Regions:
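Substrate-binding/active-site clefts of carbohydrate-active enzymes
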Residues: 26-32, 42-240
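Extended acidic/polar, glycine-enriched regions
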Residues: 1-20
């Protein structure tokens, strides 16, 4: 006979488990345990890439700035995710995003960077804030060793906005400013611009001439297609 007695601190609860466990069932997407990660806000594994492309903090609430999470941070947390029973890791789009910021919120009260991966600029490159191709390969290989699949979020609905930083870096688009007005208004580095009294972070758009076709040819090119989304109201005009 074997006598089993609950521990004094278990409130009378006694748990029995099999010594031998069944082999894990084959992976099936219908029964996958998917964990979604907004990579930038998850784990900072490499602080050296936190301010790639001269991105910087706003010195306020940091609502729309990059916080440092990256692919190396995901690698560091794979054991934790495995312990949770995760077998599919869905990560925010790691593609290269617009380098600069746009106005954040309906009131434009903060600068908004593409930390979420929604404003892709180059679908063929990784964003430097996320890491490099070696980091991505290590993440995928290390995840597979733990039985975890890696999924990319792919945001095809829209691409990146025009920002002052990208316009200056890639020399596309057109401004309503000219000559000395440019440096006087936007500064040496356009991405350092901040709203003055009576302005918001949306106000940088007031300096951009979106109707200058010649200035935007380098950005859009000749072979692009635009299509609207079903069930969205058509405003009756084209912002492009």
């Amino acid at each position: 006979q074997i006598m089993l007695q609950p521990a004094a601190t278990s409130n009378g609860l006694l748990l029995l488990e099999r010594a031998e466990t069944d082999a894990p069932a084959p992976f099936d997407w219908h029964n996958a345990t998917v964990y979604f990660v907004l990579t930038d806000r998850f784990e900072n594994g490499d602080p050296s890439n936190d301010q790639s492309y001269e991105r910087h903090k706003d010195g306020m609430a940091e609502i729309g700035t990059f916080h440092g999470g990256d692919l190396r941070g995901l690698i560091n947390k794979l054991d934790y995710l495995q312990q949770l029973g995760v077998n599919a890791l869905w990560i925010s789009a790691p593609f290269e995003q617009i380098h600069g910021w746009v106005g954040g919120g309906t009131k434009g009260d903060f600068p908004h960077y593409a930390y979420h991966g929604y404003y892709t600029q180059d679908w063929t490159n990784l964003d430097a804030n996320m890491g490099n191709e070696a980091d991505l390969r290590t993440l995928v290989d290390s995840a597979h060793q733990r039985g975890i699949r890696i999924l990319f979020d792919v945001v095809m609905n829209h691409t990146g906005y025009a920002t002052l930083a990208d316009m200056q870096e890639y020399q596309f688009g057109a401004l309503y400013l000219s000559g000395d007005e440019v440096k006087k208004t936007l500064g040496e580095r356009w991405s350092d611009w901040k709203p003055a009294a009576g302005q918001t972070w949306h106000s940088f758009n007031d300096y951009i001439n979106f109707s200058d076709k010649t200035g935007w040819d380098k950005w859009w090119g000749k072979n692009w297609i635009r299509t609207d989304i079903g069930d969205y109201d058509n405003p009756g005009f084209d912002d492009l």
